[in-house]
């Protein structure tokens, strides 16, 4: 639903969110990776990396989004912008993965199909 209704999704997030791209292509070494959804927030002056997962939150998801956030910070973010924030939207949250995640820039949220 999110990728098919990006305008609605972005408007539900609140003020200041701007769509940058979905399946946003980045090159890590000799391989391409794709960020599910990349936004920019003009109020917070930072990029927002969003990863969509159809499973319970796993520690591998944290590592994946950290790589994407670091890539954006090192290759796209301007010097006057704040560090990138990551949001993982997953079928089921896992409080233990979040508890032991050392990066407070990452937020996990559950979704429900209606």
Identify what each model region corresponds to:
Residues 1-114:
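Charged, terminal alpha-helix-loop-beta segments
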